[in-house]
Design a protein with these regions (language model features):
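ATP-binding pocket architecture of kinase catalytic cores
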Residues: 114-219
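Conserved N-terminal boundary motif of the eukaryotic protein kinase catalytic domain
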Residues: 107-115
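Active-site activation/catalytic loop segments of kinase-like enzymes and analogous catalytic loops
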Residues: 295-337, 353-371
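STAS-typified acidic loop motif
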Residues: 2-35, 53-55
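Catalytic activation segment of kinase domains across protein kinase-like and atypical kinase folds
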Residues: 272-296
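An alpha-helical support segment within catalytic cores of ATP-dependent transferases
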Residues: 106, 214-264, 268-269, 274
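ATP/Mg2+ or Mg2+-diphosphate-binding catalytic cores
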Residues: 341, 355-397
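Amphipathic alpha-helical interaction surfaces in cytosolic regulatory modules
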Residues: 27-99
């Protein structure tokens, strides 16, 4: 007997609903299926339609025509979780060229695994001596996860020391990426346990940063950091005065254009130390742009966070005193030719730019409460907006 069931799941952090389809879709019930999808379209008129076919056993040409009809109505479709049999139907008919279609993803458990890094987009766990996994926040879309995996692969091919990504998996209701990482320990853990060794590691830390910033990327493979920040500022605009939004965008636009690779969230929790040297992980915000985009984020996490919220810094990355010492040594090693006075001027400049991290926090951290968002933005109102005119156009290195 032909039957099809359609239900909608709308996660708290998701911008689009997930429409779960189960059973069979054939000529007998294709019109019923179309009607249920039309109801979903009316209820959620904006954005993509994400169809979860994990529980779908079969789809006939009649069902495919229903999907084609939605496409002709300019609704973007993303089909996830297909069984090998259903995926074969999409592939044989050429529909994989029309829609984003992905196969069912295997599940992995992180129960009992050590957390080695945490951030706004998710947490990184040590699965075994050879494997780590980044688990994304609940509700993050599969397309975003796949994009990060692709970015990591492109960075690896560019010669950037990073873990080899080899599979996208499910962890409960979240997605994750498995990475090969041989006998690795995070730099944050090493410096937390052995603070006296910080000078031993800082040269390699800065060398890795310099290697990244001397590697060119292309817009076809990597997103512009300016575009990322503009999108984030647009998202935060609902919390800000129009004048402050314009000033923030002017500050971003005043940064000299570069085609160099930028990590976007570099701190010792995102650096793994292996027998082969240091490697970067968590490339969710990697793009191309001026190195200041990395240095402002480092100033935000190493200096501003350590001083203004030491308990938070300790929980997310490591001891605040370690972060402050690492920041000081990193700055001196990254700008070896600057005098003491020049270095103080550059640090003051970077600490000002670092308040942009407060402005984009609502976009970067979708799980932040309204109270937390207001706290971040108040920091920007006090420490960025009064000096923003002085910062605009000030990057001359």
């Amino acid at each position: 007997m032909s039957n099809v069931s359609v239900e909608t799941k709308f996660g708290s952090e998701m911008s689009e609903p997930v429409i779960i389809c189960s059973g069979r879709i054939d000529s007998v019930n294709a019109s019923e299926f179309a009607g249920k999808l039309d109801e979903c379209c009316e209820k959620y008129p904006e954005g993509s339609l994400i169809l979860d076919f994990e529980r779908l056993d079969y789809i006939s040409s009649a069902g495919l025509r229903v999907l084609l009809g939605l496409s002709e109505k300019n609704r973007s479709l993303e089909i996830i979780g297909t069984s090998p049999e259903v995926y074969d139907i999409f592939e044989t008919t050429g529909f994989v060229e029309l829609f984003s279609v992905s196969k069912k993803i295997k599940s992995v458990s992180v129960e009992g695994c050590e957390i080695i890094s945490q951030g706004a987009s998710g947490s990184v766990y040590l699965i075994d001596t050879d494997t780590i996994i980044k688990v994304f926040m609940p509700g993050e879309k599969l397309s975003v996860v796949q994009q990060e995996r692709n970015t990591a692969q492109k960075a690896f091919l560019k010669g950037i020391p990073t873990a080899i990504s080899y599979d996208v998996v499910k962890v409960g209701d979240s997605y994750g990426i498995l990475y090969e990482m041989l006998k690795a320990q995070s730099l944050a853990n090493i410096l937390t346990e052995h603070p006296a060794r910080i000078e031993e590691y800082v040269n390699d830390y800065v060398d890795l940063l310099r290697q990244l910033h001397s590697t060119s990327g292309d817009r076809g493979s990597f997103t512009s950091m300016k575009d990322i920040y503009h999108e984030a500022i647009d998202y935060s605009a609902k919390y800000l005065d129009d004048k402050d939004v314009r000033k923030c965008k002017a500050l971003i636009d005043s940064i000299p254009d570069r085609d160099t690779l930028v990590h976007g969230d570099l701190h010792p929790g995102n650096i793994m130390v292996t027998d082969a040297g240091m490697m970067m992980i968590d490339l969710s915000r990697m793009g191309i742009g001026h190195p200041v985009f990395d240095l402002l984020e480092m100033a935000a996490s190493h200096k501003n966070l350590a001083e203004s919220a030491p308990d938070v810094a300790r929980m997310l990355i490591g001891p605040p005193e370690m972060l402050l010492r690492l920041w000081d040594l990193t700055l001196r090693n990254y700008f070896p030719d600057k005098s003491g006075e020049e270095l103080k001027k550059t640090e003051k400049q970077l600490l000002g730019f670092a308040r942009l991290a407060n402005v984009i926090a609502p976009f970067i951290g979708p799980t932040l409460s309204e109270e937390q968002i207001e706290g971040f933005l108040n920091e920007a109102r006090v420490n960025l907006f009064p000096i923003i005119d002085d910062l605009i156009g000030s990057i001359d290195w």
